[in-house]
């Protein structure tokens, strides 16, 4: 697993009543997707070490990145009214593919491998604005809150089944459970 991220933030206070905050976040995650140990007769296959990989680790990667920009403006008026508005744009890219046990281990100690890949790209933009007013009415203190929120999201998703090169027409291939790592091209 490899992860890295940064989130620099800049805050500017042009007046005692106004604060502006800008931030950018970048995050990257790369890991191998492991679907675990298959079962045999309804229990985990017990002839494999817990660290055994069933499938193909070189073809089971799950990289993702995210880029997020946020702007926040907070202003307090002299009459007790406060306005706080935050806008955020986010761009997410995620891809994962997996060569994994597609069946339980049979009585003859074989299993089938299956494969797929999936991509998911998403962009969000949104704004949340709150108006808050504190006031007294007789001996009672009140807080009045009014807010709006707007958002838009666009996504592009794709999913594909893997085909194995042993005949290039099936979405699974049989392997011995004693040698569960398959380096066949998918």
Segments from the language model and where they lie:
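C-terminal low-complexity, acidic/polar tails when present
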Residues: 122, 126-186
């Amino acid at each position: 697993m490899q992860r890295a991220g940064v989130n620099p933030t800049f805050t500017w206070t042009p007046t005692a009543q106004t604060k502006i905050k800008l931030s950018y976040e970048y995050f990257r995650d790369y890991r191998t997707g492991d679907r675990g140990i298959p079962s045999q007769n309804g229990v985990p296959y017990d002839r494999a070490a817990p660290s055994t990989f069933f499938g193909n680790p070189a073809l089971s990667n799950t990289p993702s990145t995210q880029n997020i920009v946020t702007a926040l403006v907070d202003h307090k008026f002299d009459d007790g009214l406060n306005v706080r508005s935050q806008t955020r744009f986010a761009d997410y890219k995620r891809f994962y593919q997996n060569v994994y046990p597609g069946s339980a281990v049979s009585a003859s100690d074989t299993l089938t491998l299956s494969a797929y890949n999936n991509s998911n790209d998403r962009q969000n933009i949104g704004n949340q604005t709150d108006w808050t007013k504190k006031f007294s009415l007789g001996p009672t203190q009140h807080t009045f809150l009014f807010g709006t929120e707007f958002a838009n999201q666009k996504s592009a998703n794709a999913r594909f089944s893997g085909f194995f090169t042993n005949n290039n027409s099936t979405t699974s291939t049989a392997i011995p459970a004693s040698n569960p790592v398959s380096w066949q091209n998918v």
